[in-house]
Amino acid sequence: MVASSTVPSVASIFAPESLLKKTKAQKQSREQIVAAAAEKKSARQKKRELIAKRAEAYEAEYRAAEREQIELARKARAEGNYFVPHEPKLIFVVRIRGINNIPPKARKIMQLLRLLQINNGIFVKFNKAIKEMLQVVEPYVTYGIPNHKTVRELIYKRGFGKVNKQRIPLSDNAIIEAALGKYSILSVEDLIHEIYTVGPNFKQAANFLWPFKLSSPLGGWRERKFKHFIEGGDAGKRDEHINGLVQKML
């Protein structure tokens, strides 16, 4: 076995010092690039694991909430009482009428709600201010309580984000993270959870979502579309029946 020599080679003796420094710098640069790439890969893997873990936790949370509602309803029936659900926190609003013959106040509210076109839809947090707005625009919209399936399918099938005032499809979690990462909303599932549960950053999440552009409902609107829902029309409050309508408009 030949022992390794520490004696410099002829090439290294006669190589200019600047070339030696350049070679050393290039080697260090390559090592740094490799290390940075490995670090990025590790960070991406950790993020994927975090997103998957959160999604599992959300699913367990949704199932637990559903079981609780079923149990409360069952208990109320057993005691001979009528089960009254909590007042909804989340409402989905759809514009069903065009621009003709809409009074200025109602038109202004439509603009505030970002319902600029017929068949536009938005999520809103239900509170006193929204309730008063909906009363004014009730002849021109329909609204109700979306379930988890509706929220999820709207965002996955018709969801677009507002990025630099542009309408961008939610084709990658990176788009959501770039806009909402500072609120710990990193993925589509995080966004769905924030909207559906009306979380602490609901306002930012809802404003990030571009108003949904829905199709006219499969089978068409009711014959007396502009009458109130309870009178056989489509306008106004329809509670859980909003879910069936949305399915026809996706």
Curated annotation (Swiss-Prot):
Q: Which Pfam families match?
A: Ribosomal_L30 (PF00327), Ribosomal_L30_N (PF08079)
User: Which Gene3D superfamilies does the record associate with it?
Assistant: Ribosomal protein L30, ferredoxin-like fold domain
InterPro entries documented for this protein: Ribo_uL30_ferredoxin-like_sf, Ribosomal_uL30, Ribosomal_uL30_CS, Ribosomal_uL30_euk, Ribosomal_uL30_euk_arc, Ribosomal_uL30_ferredoxin-like, Ribosomal_uL30_N_euk
Q: Does the keyword Ribosomal protein apply?
A: yes
- Compartments in which it is found: Cytoplasm; Nucleus, Nucleolus
A GO molecular function assigned to this protein is: structural constituent of ribosome
A GO cellular component entry from the record: preribosome
Q: Which UniProt keywords apply?
A: Cytoplasm, Nucleus, Ribonucleoprotein, Ribosomal protein
Single biological process term from Gene Ontology: cytoplasmic translation
The UniProt entry's coiled-coil ranges are none
- Specify whether Kinase is a keyword of the entry: no
The cross-references to CDD domains, in alphabetical order and at most eight, read: Ribosomal_L7_archeal_euk (cd01657)
Q: How does it assemble?
A: Component of the large ribosomal subunit (LSU). Mature yeast ribosomes consist of a small (40S) and a large (60S) subunit. The 40S small subunit contains 1 molecule of ribosomal RNA (18S rRNA) and at least 33 different proteins. The large 60S subunit contains 3 rRNA molecules (25S, 5.8S and 5S rRNA) and at least 46 different proteins.
Q: What does this protein do?
A: Component of the ribosome, a large ribonucleoprotein complex responsible for the synthesis of proteins in the cell. The small ribosomal subunit (SSU) binds messenger RNAs (mRNAs) and translates the encoded message by selecting cognate aminoacyl-transfer RNA (tRNA) molecules. The large subunit (LSU) contains the ribosomal catalytic site termed the peptidyl transferase center (PTC), which catalyzes the formation of peptide bonds, thereby polymerizing the amino acids delivered by tRNAs into a polypeptide chain.
- Which PANTHER family does the entry mention? 60S RIBOSOMAL PROTEIN L7, LARGE RIBOSOMAL SUBUNIT PROTEIN UL30
Identify its protein family.
Belongs to the universal ribosomal protein uL30 family.
Q: What's the miscellaneous note?
A: There are 3 genes for uL30 in S.pombe.
Return the NCBIfam families for the record: uL30_euk (TIGR01310)
Full protein name: Large ribosomal subunit protein uL30B
> Which organism does this sequence originate in?
Schizosaccharomyces pombe (strain 972 / ATCC 24843) (Fission yeast)
